[in-house]
Amino acid sequence: MAEERINAEQVQHVASLAKLEFTPDQLAMFTPQLEKIIGMFEELSTVDTTGVPVTSRMSDHTNTLREDVAVKSDEALREALLKNAPETANGLIKVPAIIDESGDGE
């Protein structure tokens, strides 16, 4: 059998760092999938790329975004959108905090 690259405990640890919770069944499903993905990366790392120029993007297109200009929104549309939000505050959609500022890194 091939050497184990990743185990369920490691998958659980990474999941907790990402603030994800997996059931034991999900861990059993994801662990071999991640094992396979890591194996694919290991296979790619064996490819000789000598002479291949470094690439940071697959396209020559850059800065294709629109100009950043504030425009007044349609108030009726805004109200309709906010009506669908579970919680709002001061005309904005209120979402739960996702960044832990306790400083413990967990």
Curated annotation (Swiss-Prot):
It comes from the Bacteria. It catalyses: L-glutamyl-tRNA(Gln) + L-glutamine + ATP + H2O = L-glutaminyl-tRNA(Gln) + L-glutamate + ADP + phosphate + H(+); L-aspartyl-tRNA(Asn) + L-glutamine + ATP + H2O = L-asparaginyl-tRNA(Asn) + L-glutamate + ADP + phosphate + 2 H(+). GO terms for molecular function: asparaginyl-tRNA synthase (glutamine-hydrolyzing) activity; ATP binding; glutaminyl-tRNA synthase (glutamine-hydrolyzing) activity. Keywords: ATP-binding, Ligase, Nucleotide-binding, Protein biosynthesis. SUPFAM superfamilies: Glu-tRNAGln amidotransferase C subunit. Gene3D superfamilies: Glu-tRNAGln amidotransferase C subunit, N-terminal domain. One of its GO terms (biological process) is glutaminyl-tRNAGln biosynthesis via transamidation. InterPro entries: Asp/Glu-ADT_sf_sub_c, GatC. Its EC number is 6.3.5.-. Pfam families: GatC. It is an enzyme of class 6 (ligase). Belongs to the GatC family. PANTHER family: GLUTAMYL-TRNA(GLN) AMIDOTRANSFERASE SUBUNIT C, MITOCHONDRIAL (PTHR15004:SF0). Allows the formation of correctly charged Asn-tRNA(Asn) or Gln-tRNA(Gln) through the transamidation of misacylated Asp-tRNA(Asn) or Glu-tRNA(Gln) in organisms which lack either or both of asparaginyl-tRNA or glutaminyl-tRNA synthetases. The reaction takes place in the presence of glutamine and ATP through an activated phospho-Asp-tRNA(Asn) or phospho-Glu-tRNA(Gln). Heterotrimer of A, B and C subunits. This is Aspartyl/glutamyl-tRNA(Asn/Gln) amidotransferase subunit C.
